[in-house]
Amino acid sequence: VKRAHDWGHPAIAITDHGVVQGFTDANHVIEDLDKDDPFKVIYGVEGYLVDDLTKIAENEKGQDLEGTYVVFDIETTGFSAVTDRIIEIGAVKVEDGKITDKFSTFVNPKRPIPFRITELTGITDEMVIGSLDIETILPQFIEFIGDAVLVAHNASFDVGFIEQNCKRQKIEADFTYVDTVALARVLLPALNRFKLDTVAKALNISLENHHRAVDDAGCTAEIFVKFVQMLKERELTTLAKVNEFGDLNPDSIKKLPTYHVIILARNDIGRVNLYQLVSASHLVYYNRRPRIPKSVLNEHREGLIVGSACEAGELYRALLDGKPDETIAAIVDFY
């Protein structure tokens, strides 16, 4: 701080990772300066933000847990719904807790499959070259879905690809979808990781040919059926109630992935709110690192400047992953 002052900087911001212990020493430097010296210290933190605003059931419309669900999985040429392509869709329909129908097909991506994807999935160019393209397959899959609620493991990824392809083909899409990763966080709190094979093992469900869409979809369906039973035991009968259950569970927040966020105090109110955020991150939501839920940040946002941070920030990661423009716009709007 003193060096920044001596070099002629008008101000310096302190943004240590997750803590504010440096504030006292910085304040001592300010106290040693002349009272008329305009140099300022901006108090802040580089926090670990978690998105607890995402629901277990996105876009729910009051559906009952006894309804019809399409549990699905896709394999793709990469992670970007914008620039990569679907190479396999596997899905099963679940009605009254039972699998009643299946949908399984390769999709011709009209481009070579990257070697790393072939290594992961076992899907080769030869396996998809004679398949129909997504322009033909997608309407068939939409018809298979009908009015059902979609279910997937890490659903935003799979649904994101389907929605992006619907957008390209000008197919109207208004899906309700349930994420079994989010369900696992609240129903299996003893787990530290929530990959499909980890959750399946915890529930004694067999998973063969992992990273093949139809097999992963079948496994996810069995997981979902067990989760529905666990939810009913808690007297949760609608997707709206399931979302409320997830909202009230701080243990699930502790398991969410983190993004870096820059938080600066604009004034004394902001400084108090900053202290409250840091305290909550350590005392309530700590798990390997101090976590700040988005909902808690919104409650204490007065007097704060919130920035999207570095390459580990939510916005940077979304751009790098090629997220759709609507997703990018929503992230920008938060900051």
How would you name each of these model-derived features?
Residues 1-80, 85, 90-103, 110, ...:
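Phosphodiester-processing cores and adjacent nucleic acid-binding clamps
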Residues 134:
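Conserved catalytic alpha/beta cores of large enzymes that bind or transform nucleotide phosphates
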